Amino acid sequence: MLAAVALVLAITTAAPLAQHTRLFKPEDLSELEASDRDEWQQPGKIMDILRIGEASVVADLGAGSGWFTIRLANRVGPNGRVYAEDVQKPMIQAIKVRVDRLGLKNVETIFGTDVDPRLPRPVDAVLMVDAYHEAEKPVALLTNVAKSLKPEGRIGIVDFKKDGGGPGPAMEERVDPEAVIRDVQAAGLVLRSRETFLKYQYMLVFEKPRP
């Protein structure tokens, strides 16, 4: 991970990015690697709820440092596929370093846009962790995400509660789950569950209906 952080800092210093106030700053990448994150993030339970298993094809949107990407890669195994998408090139470079170092062959990085993750094939599930509050045009983004989901494919959106404290963005940047639900339903997906097991975050699970 230190190599990935060093690479991000080098790239950021050499070629400053255009300012985007809602995006996570690449120079703060190490904050995504908190030593207690497994405890409060509960990645295994999140993946279970989304029915992610051996040979699943999944997308990690706003993948950041790749913290969740590597856990997804280990879960889906060599016959599965993980698309690690981000809209910031330093994040993509950091993930590539990390994946190469770990020898993971089932991860593909994708440089997406604010409104299109550019997923190359239909996926079983999409995971968007701590990234929804950064979306500038969430309905447009979710509409394209929905196109990439298989029928009955699932999207899990995990983000910080407005009253949850803990790590995460400033309170004024956090998004009420009811607003997320309205956005996702406007993109044609159906709410399947609201999960409350996380300490600092909420989890919303949506599904793409069959035609």
Give names to the regions the model predicted:
Residues 17-59, 65-68, 94-97:
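Class I SAM-dependent transferase core
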Residues 54-55, 78-80, 149-155:
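Short glycine-dipeptide loop
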Residues 58, 126-127:
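Hydrophobic beta-strand segment of the Class I
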Residues 73-74, 139-154:
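A short glycine-rich, Lys/Arg-flanked "PGG" loop and its adjoining helix->strand segment in the class I
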Residues 117-126:
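A short acidic, Gly/Pro-enriched loop at the edge of an enzyme's catalytic core
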Residues 192-211:
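Core SAM-dependent methyltransferase catalytic element
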